[in-house]
């Protein structure tokens, strides 16, 4: 009441000025709110697509969030959900991308593009693979995702790239076993090397490192003075690749053991 009385005690030109400022602020706020709400779901989706295309990812995410909040039951929300996951994937935010692709598969399991969400969820795991790390959780998760994908979506347009990624995942896992076995061999832990390299032969018999693995098995047994086993692996190397450098070395070992 005191403020109101103070206002009326001011000269009329000041009162008019304050009223004018108040009304301008009021209408400006209403106008902004009105403009924000004036965008339809389809407009918000188009805007977010354009922003994403122009590499304005954060603004695109904001538009999608507005779409989700203002139009929770719209058909555009479905496309917005996929677009949000795609933006995270494009920005190499693979944990976030994986989360949103998973969410899409849960919310829209019968959608015509649900196979795409499953594929890119597995791709997100694949992208999280750090070849320099010993943590193989992401590549194992990716492998599982791609294998399940080809079972669930045998007619998908993503079938071929999914199979290619399975091969890459298997290569990474095989290479990991091989490198560990090779490390044990180099450090003189021959029994540990033998265990790893034998596991490689059993689990990945057609891998590109198999020939070298067989040679290192022969070398490991040779250094353990288990000459019968060493001989068997050297002969296998010569038989499988007679002109290779490993075969050349194997022949020298066999000659030395006579």
At which residue positions do the language-model features occur?
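Acidic, polar-rich low-complexity tracts and alpha-helical solenoid repeat scaffolds
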Residues: 7-9, 26-258
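Sec-dependent bacterial lipoprotein signal peptides
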Residues: 1-30
